[in-house]
UniProtKB/Swiss-Prot annotation:
Protein name as it appears in the record: N-(5'-phosphoribosyl)anthranilate isomerase
Family that this chain belongs to: Belongs to the TrpF family.
Source species: Desulforamulus reducens (strain ATCC BAA-1160 / DSM 100696 / MI-1) (Desulfotomaculum reducens)
Domain of life of the source: Bacteria
EC number(s) from the headed UniProt entry: 5.3.1.24
One GO BP: L-tryptophan biosynthetic process
GO molecular function, one term: phosphoribosylanthranilate isomerase activity
Keyword hit for Metal-binding: no
Length: 208
């Protein structure tokens, strides 16, 4: 079953609705973004979520100690890193990590295997931006790619293309933000429809 992460959640009610609709993880942004929240807001979201829903904090080149403090304060389960963080940074953080890799070329994806993290998130490459750009990339870059850890697919996913994406890439999970928004705000019907579509394709692909 392909996992689903709803990223950029700013409201506890949206987080709970997404979790109850079947989201496996909720992403909370601490980096510079229109979706950024304060640690206090993030803590409220984390505390509202039901059991078995992963709480993922998104950071970009944040000092390690600051990430650790925020993670402990909010009750984060996983740290997702979108900057130039090194392998040592990931190893020494003390939390399960997801490392975001921009899909520049095949070489950078293959080199990402060296990161000591729990999963790799492959996102569109847009110069000057660290994810959340709403753009897709050429999924052919992932064809035959040998990764030694789970692959999470991101980059411009929405209800119209996620079925094709899952069927073609066969990722461990998918990550969506702008694809379930209306006028920059998370939309519960879109979230439900997105998760439903992923589950349908997952079932057809695996038969379970």
């Amino acid at each position: 079953m392909v996992r689903v992460k709803i990223c950029g959640v700013q409201d506890p009610k949206i987080g709970v609705a997404a979790a109850l609709a079947g989201a496996d993880a909720i992403g909370i942004v601490f980096a510079s973004s229109s979706r950024r929240v304060t640690p206090e807001q993030a803590r409220e979201i984390c505390q509202a979520l039901p059991p078995f829903t992963a709480r993922v904090g998104i950071f970009v080149d944040t000092p390690q100690q600051e990430v650790q403090q925020i993670a402990h304060f909010c009750g984060l389960d996983v740290i997702q890193l979108h900057g130039g963080e090194s392998a040592d940074y990931c190893r020494d953080l003390g939390f399960r990590c997801i490392k975001a890799i921009p899909a520049r070329n095949r070489q950078c994806l293959e080199e990402a295997n060296a990161f000591p993290v729990s999963a790799l998130l492959v996102d569109s490459y847009v110069n000057g931006k660290s994810g959340g750009n709403g753009c897709t990339f050429n999924w052919h870059l992932l064809e035959g790619l040998q990764l030694n850890k789970p692959l999470i697919l991101a980059g411009g996913l929405n209800i119209e293309n996620v079925g094709r994406a899952v069927a073609y890439v066969r990722p461990y999970g998918v990550d969506v933000s702008s694809g379930v928004e209306v006028k920059g705000q998370k939309d519960i019907p879109l979230i439900k429809a997105f998760i439903k579509r992923v589950r349908e394709v997952s079932f057809n692909a695996t038969g379970s």
